[in-house]
Amino acid sequence: VALTDPTRDRAQRLRFSDKVPARGRDVATVLIDGVETTDLVTTAIDVALRSDRGHALVILDAVLRRGGDRHDLLAELESRPTRRGVQRVRALLELADGRIESAGESLALLVMHDLGLPRPELQHEFSVDGRCIARVDFWFPEQGVVVEFDGLVKYRAGEVRGARTAEEVVIAEKFREDAVRAVPGVRGVARLIWREVLPGGDAPITLRRSGLPVPLASRTTPTW
């Protein structure tokens, strides 16, 4: 449990809770089920400052996806009396994007950024004869490479599959990927899974094989 303490100017980690310092600053709060909590922007910055870069970006993307304002997040960040972690979170706010649809996509974007790749187009739609045939997570137009994060939920979770079996979902995904590969200008497709985007994973190898300019020295996924 994280608690915001207006009497503290330094963080404190206890066995069952973390105390976030709030001395000298106004803390915006809201009531949720009768419990006073910090508002969305304040909470997001509190968590981002105390998290590694991967988890922080997941939080920031989620807030933007829910309608949060980047300028409000930045203003809250810059208002903090401590400078520890501010530069790191400021850089993540430049990378964060509300079009990211899942935690896995957030981590994939961070990994590609850390590998020095150009910023991809997000949620790019491919159309043939005026009909959208696919919307992909990441598109690198100069390299002609599509990157998808495959969280595997679509194959396992019934609420995602609907009435389809896992086998039917796999077949549909195969047809979809074939259609994307057939689009003029698409020269490669890479699928990243969870273990590849985690530190020490094989994301650099998968991305390099697709045709993206990943440095040869990058053999495993960087630490966030």
Language model segments and positions:
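Extended aliphatic helical segments
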Residues: 1, 20, 27-30, 35, ...
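Phosphate-handling catalytic interfaces
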Residues: 1-109, 113-119, 123
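Basic, glycine-rich
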Residues: 71-72, 99, 127-134, 141-145, ...
